[in-house]
Amino acid sequence: MLRLTLLGGVGEVGGNKVLLEGEGCALFLDFGVSYHRRGRFYEEFLNPRSSFGILDPLEMGLLPPLEGIYRDDLQPGGQAQKTLWERYRERPAYRSLDKDSVFGVLCSHAHLDHSGYISVLNLDIPVYTTLLSALVMKAIQDSSRSDFEQEIVYAVERRPRNDSGLLETPPASQQPARQRPFVVFGDTPTWEAVDFWRQTPATRPLAPKDLSFAGGEAALGPFRVRCYPVDHSIPGAAGFLVEGGGLAVAYTGDLRFHGHKGDATEAFVRAAAEAARRLPLVLLCEGTRAGDDDHGPITEQQVAERALDFMRTAEGLIIADFGPRNLERLTIFHRLARHIGRQLVILAKDAYL
């Protein structure tokens, strides 16, 4: 028998965290940051206190109180560590989990509202995702500020500063960053991808852990997991079909039909329908823009055509504004700028990505 616990992403945009359990084993379907909840307490230059580790996110309700799965080095040292979980054990969402029973995180894509809090999970818990998503996650971390919330692919393990329990980051000369295990579906990593994975532009050295390759599916304890590419604004997005305990779970992550890979989303839908003919199916579906729309969505091709019509006649500076990490939209404007003889100016982190 399978058990599903929705820990985030319900009644909100993003923050997806789903716990799937069966036969003493567990998987997470995404482990993201809730932008709305985080935005109630923090902003760009006001973030959780690094010396307090996971205490601030737990206390603010940004992390579910799941004892046993978070990084030990982000839990206060000394006496504070002994009493950390006492305050949460009476909360309704509290669970105690054995990290060794967690076979991994199935991460649908690299947007932080689906992947961001992988950073605080125990570093022995592997991430299963597509090769492209893994590389994008690393590129995002390479070009982001250095703090524990950004440490999805590799992490600097903290240590207690003193008996107060406060944490500190060891100097780069004393401790390399530790890489989390990643298992990728789909394409076999090229040597360029492997080389990129094993390096970091930071001054702190990296203790690399090679990418593992799963092909099209993986057996994780009692679960059979299959990964399907889907259309989304960031490369590498995928949906998952998980079978076990006489049940199938289709998890869409974020998906759409109106981009350049809409046919991939259609293929995932057909695979889920086929699974539903064999087994009872639970569908966990993205619903941010669900609803009746007689006009249908505007396709990315239509966006490109309308933008080009404007850009051809515009004089002076043209400013294009769209969401961060929307690489498809970025490449559209790069192509259009070249087409009309304009120069595209972007941030260094976008160029790195």
Regions found by a protein language model. Give the residues of each.
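His/Asp/Glu-rich metal-coordinating catalytic cores
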Residues: R3-T5, G9-E12, N16-G104, S119-E328, ...
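Metallo-beta-lactamase
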Residues: V102-D113
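Gly/His-enriched, cation/cofactor- and phosphate-binding structural elements
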Residues: L344
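A contiguous, basic/glycine-rich beta-loop/short-helix subdomain that forms a polymer-engagement track
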Residues: L347-L353
